[in-house]
């Protein structure tokens, strides 16, 4: 379901895929070729949520903010199943593993990988191209070329799947 909040209307690129049973409300911007998967909730009723190009937000994720603290996802970000993102910044090509939580004013560096089930506390900065894991998340190591290749594959596959599902939606209309 997509609807405004007060005077703010979601802005969704025509090429983006929005799965059924997804809720998007308020001051939300979703970029080209992004995909928002089943049962996810993106609320822009407190501050803006800005989602770049080729971002995938997987099933059952929740994106929200605190007053005056936007939520920003740069291009080609992967957000795993059941992730909570709250007023944080996720830099380009980062991957947030399934079931992770990233809290207010945390920043995930470009190309960083947050391991499944991690908690990134308020204000924590994760450096670019590192693997961070745990509750609270701690940097474990630098990413290997194989890690980076795998992250790129996941992002690419979700972009392709999103376009496939979008074509199915068009056929149903």
Where are these predicted regions, by residue range?
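Terminal amphipathic alpha-helical/low-complexity segments used for targeting or macromolecular assembly
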Residues: 1-15, 124-130, 135-173
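Structural signal for interior beta-strand "rungs" in well-ordered beta-sheet cores
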Residues: 4-127, 131-132, 137-139
